[in-house]
Amino acid sequence: MMTHIKIILACLALTCSSLVRAQDGDNIRPQVVLHTTKGDVTVQLYNETPLHRDRFLALVKEGFYNGLLFHRIIYGFMIQTGDAATRDSLVETPSLDKSLLQKIPAEIHYPMFMHKRGALCAAREGDGANPQRMSSPTQFYIVYGKRFNDEMLDKQQLSINRSMGEQAITLTDEVRDIYKRIGGSPHLDGAYTVFGEVTEGIQVVRDIDWTPTDENDRPTEPVRIVSAEVISQ
């Protein structure tokens, strides 16, 4: 009898162990490296934003981002890419399934995910043309931003209240602490989908952010994604 009990307990232990491993596997965040003309940037993608995660992975695997410019750079704010029209003429344009070119429903999870320095975010049209805040099919930006003090964050909160009205988010104490220590761009919180973050290469993001630009925020010297690849999934 004792032998049977031991066998049952051993099986239960193996089952529980397998479940734990499966759950851990589900929590593993995919990683992508962007090889740029300024250096490499590694990002991890949030599993809590599955629509954006899966779209980004699919586009990377199709080679969509290869040869694209960082076409919009705002010093002390962010760097943006993903416009197919900016592709290097020497790089072949991939043939994409139409489903990859459809807008993505918003997956906004504030304050879990915020516009801290290094945040990977989906670009989109403004609220007037896009009240549901659906994301661009392909374009994204990486936040560099700046560090804030309490007075500056108070002003940011007032600005958020004015621009978002009843939908305004609150900059919690935890969020404010991150903006004071790490930096970022809090005025976008609650309005755009944040679907990942930089894990390596934030200094490369800084170097791109510091690239001289013209009056249209376009870099005066081309900065491109040479290639992008999934390194873990």
Give residue spans per PLM region.
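N-terminal secretory signal peptides that target proteins for export/translocation
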Residues: 1-3
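Bacterial N-terminal signal peptides
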Residues: 6-17
